[in-house]
Every structure is written in structure tokens, then in C-alpha cells.
Amino acid sequence: MPLSPYLSFAGNCSDAIAYYQRTLGAELLYKISFGEMPKSAQDSAENCPSGMQFPDTAIAHANVRIAGSDIMMSDAMPSGKASYSGFTLVLDSQQVEEGKRWFDNLAANGKIEMAWQETFWAHGFGKVTDKFGVPWMINVVKQQPTQ
């Protein structure tokens, strides 16, 4: 079974989906808003397990595919700023041009942690935190020697 990360956004999941579609070519596989959920499945003020209320337009669950890998996401906080730590999403490419394009797209309005460059292990590598605060490594691995 594959391992899929789940990103929690602070009321801007729809914006993040559109951003990843534009910058990384993400394919939207599934999306449901809180307003589209059956009323029986929605939190009510008196029995809300999360203790939070979401607008109907907030995303309850979404799944996108980026470079063959699924990333799930939702609006887990009604507003504020999401904080991401302790992990980094890694995008591997076989083509330097593709990796550089991904890096440049994520770096626009983001923060470069390590500039795009060739390393001893990669034809191209860079670390960036995107405009939503999600950390990424973009990697174009060199051919591994056979043993």
C-alpha cells in the first residue's frame, strides 16, 4: 500500500489545489466541500467532535496526484496560518528542466531554503517552502552506480 501525506490548510485549501495544479501540474482526483457533505455527516454546534465550524465552501477532503504520487488535503482549521514541521515533501524528476521548473514555480512567492544547484548526488536539487508554508525538496537524481 502506498503512503500518502495529508496536508491541513487554514481555510485556503481550494487556493492550494489551484496553485499545485498551476505550478506542478497536479491532477485533481477528488474534492468535497463541507457544504457538499450529507447533512448527517456535518458537525453541528452541539455535537461537533472537532469543536470547529467550517464554512460550506471549505474543503472537507481532496486528493491530488503530483508526479504519480497522491497527496490528500483539507481545510482543518477555519482560519489562521497552518504550520508544517518535521517533514518535507520530495518531488523526484528524471529531467533537469522539469525539476528546475517545479523549483522555480514553488519558489515564486515562497522561500528558497537551498538554491537550485547540481550536487554530488543530483543533476539538480533545491529546497523551498511554498507560499502556503509547505516544505519541498526537488531532486533530479544522478544515475546510481551498479554494484
UniProtKB/Swiss-Prot annotation:
Gene3D superfamilies: 2,3-Dihydroxybiphenyl 1,2-Dioxygenase, domain 1. Disruption phenotype: No effect on phosphonate metabolism in B strains. It comes from the Bacteria. SUPFAM superfamilies: Glyoxalase/Bleomycin resistance protein/Dihydroxybiphenyl dioxygenase (SSF54593). InterPro entries: Glyas_Bleomycin-R_OHBP_Dase, Glyas_Fos-R_dOase_dom, PhnB-like. This is Protein YjdN.
